Amino acid sequence: MDKSSGELVTLTPNNNNTVQPVALMRLGVFVPTLKSLKNSKKNTLSRTDATEELTRLSLARAEGFDKVEITGPRLDMDNDFKTWVGIIHSFARHNVIGDKVELPFVEFAKLCGIPSSQSSRRLRERISPSLKRIAGTVISFSRTDEKHTREYITHLVQSAYYDTERDIVQLQADPRLFELYQFDRKVLLQLKAINALKRRESAQALYTFIESLPRDPAPISLARLRARLNLKSPVFSQNQTVRRAMEQLREIGYLDYTEIQRGRTKFFCIHYRRPRLKAPNDESKENPLQPSPAEKVSPEMAEKLALPEKLGITLDDLEKLFKSR
């Protein structure tokens, strides 16, 4: 529902956009490929605490689960994210029988953004590894008390079957997770920006995160954007990656921003977002945010403000702490 008008808005995927669950976009399930050979060969298992977002699912509420964790191989932006887009499109556009959907393999490849001109072998080489990684991503719901533990373990996709000779793909989802595929807090993700950022995975990942934020978002800390990318390089190198990705988002016309500093913490103020990569007819609807001037703080206060970052404590950590009180 559009809060400003009260109008019910239906979000429908097509070739230019996809409906993505906000949780997966904010949590960093899809991240840039680790570029260095050293990092790409080790620590490729990703572990994400999804408690805050996914305990809102009816499965978690009904069973009283209070902890949700997503584990599995790192899912990249260049191939895995596009395959996930194809999966979302498949369930949205085709008849779901029970917990399965079936469609032509060539059509599934198109939904994944792969040109139909590519050979069958190249299609398999791109789709097969991504399906394996996505199907290998585990979502666990659990609750532990002093004496007992209760846990439900499932996968992002339960199974995938394809036969290029028969030209079919069959995808199976956990019925108890259909709500995740059709989460009520969704955004319409324009694929135009993703396509304009080919091979710029860090910019793609930040795009999916920023586009999931509500209208007129608060300033986003540099530390939060680093966390979204989930890189393994030194912090100064990660900062460079974030700034380069933000500049790439500005270059394609998606957003404009100002980087500011409060105390020792860096923030990005987003002035507007344009997922269609062009200005709207009425630019006043963008409600641009003006950057807040840097406040003068005493050396003592500046030292206190810098302490959480030194300890590796993010704004999300502090927010969770205050909510738990």
Swiss-Prot record:
Q: Name one GO molecular function term.
A: DNA binding
Where does the secretion signal sit in this chain?
none
Q: Which GO biological process annotations does it have?
A: DNA replication initiation; plasmid maintenance
Chain residue ranges for the region called Disordered? 279-300
The record's keywords, sorted A to Z, are:
DNA replication, DNA-binding, Plasmid, Plasmid copy control
Give a yes or no for keyword Acetylation in this entry. Answer: no
Question: InterPro entries, alphabetically?
Answer: Initiator_Rep_WH1, WH-like_DNA-bd_sf
* UniProt superkingdom: Bacteria
Write out the similarity annotation.
Answer: Belongs to the initiator RepB protein family.
What is the annotated role of this protein in its UniProt record? Answer: This protein is essential for plasmid replication; it is involved in copy control functions. In vitro, binds to the DNA repeat units, BCDD'D'', EFG and HIJ.
Protein name as annotated: RepFIB replication protein A
Q: Which gene encodes it?
A: repA
